Amino acid sequence: MKIFDTHVHIDEYAKPEPGRLLKSMDAHGVDRTVLLSEEPFFFGKEGLTPEEWNRARLARLMEWTNTSGGRLLPVYYIDPTEPDAIDQADRAIDAGAIGFKVICETFFPGDDRAMPVYQHIADAGKAILFHSGILWDYGNNGNYNRPCNWECMFDISGIRFALAHISWPWCDECISLYGKFSAMSYSPRYKGQKMYIDMTPGTPTYYRQKAMDALYSVFSEGYEYLDRRLLFGSDSFTGDFDSFFQADLAAKDSEKLQKAGFTAETAENIICAN
């Protein structure tokens, strides 16, 4: 079984070592890995200005990915509320970024500053991976990341977006929101919006099988295209990167998906093709 991991973080200030990652991937049957760039300018970065920091981390992202033959895929982590967010998005796209990562740490997804940035990204044909669910940091920001806050995507034409971690602990809310977007294709408001669910852990082991059972249940009851809108991810980091973990998680997730009722072929597509 080939593996496509859509959720691996680049450690801050890390020296790009794509060869190390590719060697580990080859050893464990991992075909492709999405690398998420270092974080935006939330705090001071060694005396750099925000623009200097953002340019530097974009350059490192491309150093991690440019020589990988398409196996390490660059996704740029952007704060859509920053004044120059659209300029950042354009620089990232010009450099070769395939999409964007957003964490709503201090703002709601539908913030007026962010919405034009989402539309700009959608117009460029790029997708957005959002953190969703409880955020394990020291901020009071859980309510920013509840799935129903992404109803704002109804107002973004052509957007493709994913909610990560099955939005744990709000997995049912995430799945319900998917159902709403699935049904939206029959609405006059439908303008090509597509929602995906990133199954990257965040869901503790006890809940993970339950979440997959719920996903299959609603799929079997008519949530359209759900089998093609689930993504596999490991939430790994480049610093201690070991594709054994990716492969082990992929095998366990495949087993859970099949236990829930998905066919072996569908489980394989979720792990390697979606």
Q: What are the language-model segments listed below?
A:
Residues 8, 13, 20-47, 71-77, ...:
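Divalent metal-dependent hydrolysis catalytic cores, especially in the metallo-beta-lactamase
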Residues 4-11, 131, 165:
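Histidine-centered divalent metal-coordination motifs
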Residues 10-18, 41-44, 50-54, 78-85, ...:
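Acidic-and-aromatic substrate-binding clefts and catalytic sites of carbohydrate-active enzymes
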Residues 99, 111-231:
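Catalytic pocket-lining loop regions of alpha/beta-barrel enzymes
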Residues 47-144, 196, 201:
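Active-site gating/metal-coordination segments in enzymes
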Residues 7, 25, 61, 65, ...:
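Conserved, mostly hydrophobic/aromatic
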Residues 1-9, 16-32, 90, 224-231, ...:
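Mid-to-C-terminal alpha-helical segments outside catalytic/metal-binding sites
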Residues 39-43, 65-82, 216-224, 228:
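Metal-cofactor-binding active-site regions of metalloenzymes
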